[in-house]
Amino acid sequence: MRRFSAIIFLLCTFALAMSAQHIQRNYHDRSMSDVLIDLDKASKRYKISFIYNELEDFTVTQNVKTANIPDAIRKVIGFYPMQMTVGDSLITVECIRKSERKLIGRLIDNHNLPVEFANIQLLNPKDSSFLCGGVSNANGDFVIPCQQKQALMKVSFVGYKTIYKLVPIARIGNVRMQANSYLLKGVTVEAARVVEKVDRQIIFPTKEQVKTASNGYDLLDNLSLPTIIVNRAERKVLSLKGGEVQIRINDVKASMQDVLALQPDEVTKVEFINVPGLKYGDSNLDAVINYQVRRRYAGYVGGVSTMQGTKAGFNNSDGYFKYNVKKSEFSINYSFSYRSVEERSYESLGTYHLPTGETLHRNYLGYDSPFLYTTNNVQLGYNLSEPDKYTLNVRLNFYNHNSPVRGMNQLYQESGKANQYLQNNRKMLEQIPSLDIYYSLNMPHDQNLALNLVGTYIGTDYQYRMREYTFNKSPDESVKNAPLTDYSYDATGRKRSLIGEGTYSKNWKQMALSVGGQYNISHTDNIYVGSSNADTELKYSNLYLFTQLQGQQKWFSYQVGVGATRSSIHQGENGYSKWLFRPQVTLQAKASDRLSFKWSSKITSDIPSLSDLSELRQYSNSFEARDGNSGLKPFTGYNNTLSASWNIPLMSVYLEGNWTYYDKPIATSILPEKREDGSYLFVSKPENQKSHDYKHLLLTPEVHLIKDHLDLNLMCEYQNVKTKGLDYSHEFNYFSYGAEIRYMTGNWNIGYGAYKVEKSFWGEKTNGGEPTSNLAVTYSYKNWQFGVLGLFVFYPHGCVYKDELFNKYVQQKNKVRLADQGNMLVFAASFNFSHGRRYHTGSRKLNNSDRDNGIR
């Protein structure tokens, strides 16, 4: 303990020494354009350049604590398909997945709380091949550029039921993720064999669930965890709440290759941690799924699998092999993905009302544009462990992503102006080697010490081409003339990072204590050449400390804790540092063997971003601009969730109510501003509005029609949102519903799910989700499994996602279409082999990784 305390003290001291200047912002549901404007205002060295309309649909909900502007931009970009190019004095941010169409929506849970880091995959409706994907942010928002008119959206997250919806590539509003709520605390549910604890559900897979699964993703999909969506085609696990889902194997954070190499018959139980504690360190984490697995002590295990789509280009292929001898395990994993999409487009129609009474119209009409990428991932591993004593795990990873084509072309129309053709394409090559070392030591008196160290290098070569032409009959004819503007550039990025983490835990009979910390330091250097010339060097450090206490007294369980984070980001003379605190309480009471209640409460504090605070005006075009606001103040959020679970042999019911209130939230105001020439400029400005009141009621009954064979899951949800601004007041009411049925018998597994389009609301905007209609049929024979996945079934024309803006001066309707996603079929096959006996490998409790290259 003394050594551990000394390490934490040194980390804190080092972090303070490295943090002379910091950039600290708290963005909530802010458009990416607004965020970049805010950061631009906060930057003394750099000018941030971007195309306003290209990034406006992407929203940011993020606490930014960095040492410089480049790191701050990387932070807000997150998992969005964007690239940042840094020059001497100019930073260019662009969407690397250009498309006239975008799938825009928000993932929320049964309490109307955002689901963070959920995995969203857009599949070809014809063959279920992967088109593109994304991850929801801290507010549950997701924006996925896609040229298709419609696609089969698969949303998955630990603790939530996987959502399959055939959606148009447009704004689809809220997408409700339902928790598998038939689990009861301390009660073994016979149909699913589940025991519920204060922070998790412990699921013991049934024979049928194991028999019809070929890997960890299949097994998780069969479990139908509440609010979790498993995308078999994309090999991702998403949360209906929109947040992140973390996958672990024996308490060690697992990669996609690890889950694919997981043999279902080796899984003893699955822990669905639906209320992640502070020890996980990520406030955006919706759930943690931990597979408890028996390991071999002699012999080998291996397998190969492939998925091939029938529409567009789609292929996933994987292979793995593990060899065990005594206390050691040697492993190698390889995965390959290929995506090629032709029919992606994005449409935006806007109406602008001038104070004079005149009305103007401004439209972006999308052309089908291509999209192509391949990924290769190799992982070498070594594990040395003695059960109940120690575990040493070493992994060497190499990730390669090559995207030679990412087009997004549009016809631009505006009242009183000649039409223009916008030609856009991006190319990116990314290579990421990393080394991960983990050690866990079990000590006397039920104590454990776990240490993790990860070093990563990220090399990125990026090419961006953006040109505007006078439209002449057709796109081909238009590009024959000289471009009106050219925003093209090349970027080269190099990043080095080191992540160290240590945790100490002590268990008593009815109580457990966890204390720990993590320190993350990185150095990023991105060079931009072209329309933007810059060399951006970013230094980042982050220190996280936490303490958490969990216990149980007869019918009552609790989990309380507090976390503190100090982030530091510096870019040249610009930077910031700030402490943030996260109190969290979860209580659970068992009323009877069949009925339990759970209450969870947390307080969040959101601060304005540097870009929002900067008094800088940024023009997206001659018609629109974005201002900062130095008078912005932090705002507080209060989140309370009350749920009840009731179970009888043939039926389980989960009921959840959530109330979230934001006091003086930051949202966008839009006002017309008269210029000297008499024309009007529509100015968007972040301001502290009055309030945002969100109420949510969710009911998810599950009926076990035939025990262990046929289950029917239903979902109905009502949400009421009241937004009060300085000059507006809106109230939104929305009702959604859905159903999913799964039949398992013998070697067959058949499932179908359909859900109504979800919608989300913030300020004066509504974001629409997509309808879900997905079918999966698999057949297992000995070590083989064959399957057919149907994405966006009964949607032959693909998906359309919609969103709207209801400002009194500006009204907008946006649609993202994925035309080639409708009725898409994906054929799958896998083969596994093994030999030898097993043992239970020591658990790994920590794991870290870095995939953020900093280029936009």
Regions found by a protein language model. Name each.
Residues M18-K98, S128-C132, V194-V198, I228-Q246:
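N-terminal export/assembly leaders
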Residues L36-S43, Y80, L90-E94, K98-E100, ...:
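Short, acidic, small-residue-rich periplasmic hinge/interaction motif at the N-terminus
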Residues K126-D141:
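Short, acidic Ser/Thr/Gly-rich low-complexity loop/linker segments typical of extracellular
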Residues S305-M307, H361-D368, K417-N425, P483-D490, ...:
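Extracellular loop and loop/strand-boundary signature of outer-membrane beta-barrel proteins
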Residues N316, E343-E358, P404-Q420, Y462-N472, ...:
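Outer-membrane beta-barrel translocator domains and adjoining extracellular loop/strand segments
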Residues T375-S403, N424-N574, K578, K590, ...:
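Face-selective signature of the C-terminal outer-membrane beta-barrel domain
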Residues S488, S497-I499, L538, Y544-F546, ...:
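Outer membrane beta-barrel strand-and-loop segments of large Gram-negative receptors
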